[in-house]
Amino acid sequence: MNNSKQFLKYQPLLEWLAKHEAYISPKLYIASSGVAGDGIFSTFDIDELEVLAKIPRRIILSPRNSRFGDSLYTHFNESNRSDDINFDNRDQVGLVMLVITVILENITDSPWNAYLNTLDETCMPDSPLLWKDKTCLEGTSMLDVINTNLRVYKNQYDQLVRPYFYKHADLKQLCPKWNQYLETCVLVQSRCFYVNSYYGLSLIPFFDIFNHKSGPAIASLHCQESNDHKGDIKIEFISFQYIRKMSEIFNSFGNFAADELFTQYGFIDTACKVWRVDMTMIAYETNRNFYMEWIHKKRIINTQELLVTPTTYANDKSETLRSVMIRQPMDLYIITDHGPSYGLYLYLFFCIYKIKFQKCDMNIVMLTKYFNEIWAVFIAHKEGEKEKVVAQLSGFSFYCKAIEFLQMLCQKRISRFKNGGLTAEAYKTLLCDPTLKRENRSRLVLQIFYHELNLLEKSMQETIYLCTENFED
């Protein structure tokens, strides 16, 4: 592998990898990336499906390979049985275990020292989770996402991390402070890989130098589904397309929305076209009783009995859009190139149902039947089938009321920005300022305001069109 002098910090790592029989293609070299930090580039043309690197599974940094692994798995299995703790997300628990592993290996005499020494301050993403002052994001949906993530991480720290350290007398003094844990969590989350069901989330030396970007992966990890970590099975990093020499080689972020990527990596990926605005707080503030009843009802609604399910609703979307919509189908948000999410549409229909049938007992069978009637109008309207819409004028009337309710929610959501009434177009003009550098936080904030306002304004224009469209020939 070719390296320039300023990247001598990687030399001990490369020697350690060679000692453990890892393979790094001689066509690769490490250099400063135009995206973030360091990256891996090609010195020669690389063919499709060419192996770029192989790392033995026994040397990846994972709770499975760590001397602390047994005590971690025992602690987390016991915590999972506790009535006071409920972490049913496997990736969340896997991340917490990996973060604890990294903290312990980093402050003790570790076999991964050669790798851990490369994770200096230049590797730390400028994640908004670590920003001391977040007032510049006040009113944005992005800030809601950030605060939600912080609450989740703090909850994990209080309920899982501290109890683990304090349970073991020899580890108690090593328990990280909350800020130290959060910093390590941000670093690890930005660099870890899902290996397989046995190893889960892990740090893979060298592989994590490859930068990410949205869209199809240029190269990606491949690992057999096996728990044989004592053998010489290797994890491979393979090119998925032809790569020209002197090009940076990217892994893919996966299919995530812009808010998810920003909180994890600390920059706006221009290739990511999927933005969301969360409408949950506005829905709650507008009518708390409706919202709280919806929270209860949505748990018992059998979506398979609905005319359109979360899966079919997202079938004709792009891969990223479809992935985001299916992962969180019942969340209340507005999304790029689509408008209201599946869950938000159902909530709107539910609210109109409540207004019409205030004194009636809300039977789930009736509610499902009502949803299907409205969905029939919704689909016919979206597909321009005027005859079907006219044939269901009663349903169309309810549909229009739901759309009007959405318009009101959008107006209220825009008022939360507290930005003096600036429009998306005004922010677009500000973004043309040549003095704003790509990595400048001010530019990031302007981009967030622009995309979120643009999404809300377009959604409002769409609702006006839907409610005023003339169906006469």
Swiss-Prot record:
InterPro entries: SET_dom, SET_dom_sf, SETD3_SETD6_MTase. GO terms for cellular component: cytosol; nucleus. One of its GO terms (molecular function) is protein-lysine N-methyltransferase activity. One of its GO terms (biological process) is ribosome biogenesis. It comes from the Eukaryota. Residues 26-254 form the SET domain. This is Uncharacterized protein C16C6.01c. The lineage of its organism: Eukaryota, Fungi, Dikarya, Ascomycota, Taphrinomycotina.
